[in-house]
Amino acid sequence: MKLDVFAGQEKSELSMIEVARAILEERGRDNEMYFSDLVNEIQNYLGKSDAGIRHALPFFYTDLNTDGSFIPLGENKWGLRSWYAIDEIDEEIITLEEDEDGAQKRKKKRVNAFVDGDEDAIDYRDDDPEDEDFTEESAEVEYDEEDPDDEKSEVESYDSELNEIIPEDDFEEVDINEEDEEDEEDEEPVL
């Protein structure tokens, strides 16, 4: 790959974020890229080893999120913020949601160059099967208001557990005399 923006510059002096911006600018607006594809193209351009990319990957992802010129487009796709007007960003999100209502799209199997040789690595792009089972019907679960009978049964079960520990026969009856307490509060301390 040849990027005209960096003609005459030493590749070792370029940052991954600069190369990512140049790659996305060269591809154009309708060619958003998956994060893994973007990283692979950066690696090919810079000629870095797998170990070098693995080491720099967390820093690059942080820079990608904090740099104001990139925008996540969902499903781990990235584009340049300059491609979208502020009002258009919401429209893009809405159109993505409308597309999901239609026919299901077949998912492409993506190969991650970083996970192939490492059995312990986790591929975060894999969807959970639980996510696929989610439907709007399951989102509309109705919750009943608090049932006073449930509270009563909780109190009864608590009382029965207490009775197992200390039988009711062992409790002493205590009379609370509220007048005595009021009298004590009214009295002035003697000095």
Curated annotation (Swiss-Prot):
Xref: InterPro entries: Asxl_HARE-HTH, RNAP_delta_N_dom_sf, RpoE
GO CC terms, sorted: DNA-directed RNA polymerase complex
Superkingdom classification of source: Bacteria
Occurrences of domain HTH HARE-type (ranges): 14-83
GO molecular function: DNA-directed RNA polymerase activity
Region (Disordered): 119-191
Pfam hit, one: HARE-HTH
One Gene Ontology term from the biological process aspect of the record: regulation of DNA-templated transcription
UniProt entry keywords in alphabetical sequence: DNA-directed RNA polymerase, Nucleotidyltransferase, Transcription, Transferase
Entries under NCBIfam families matching the protein: RNAP_delt_lowGC
Role summary: Participates in both the initiation and recycling phases of transcription. In the presence of the delta subunit, RNAP displays an increased specificity of transcription, a decreased affinity for nucleic acids, and an increased efficiency of RNA synthesis because of enhanced recycling.
Oligomer status and interactors: RNAP is composed of a core of 2 alpha, a beta and a beta' subunits. The core is associated with a delta subunit and one of several sigma factors.
Family of the protein in this entry: Belongs to the RpoE family.
Protein name: Probable DNA-directed RNA polymerase subunit delta
Organism: Streptococcus pyogenes serotype M6 (strain ATCC BAA-946 / MGAS10394)
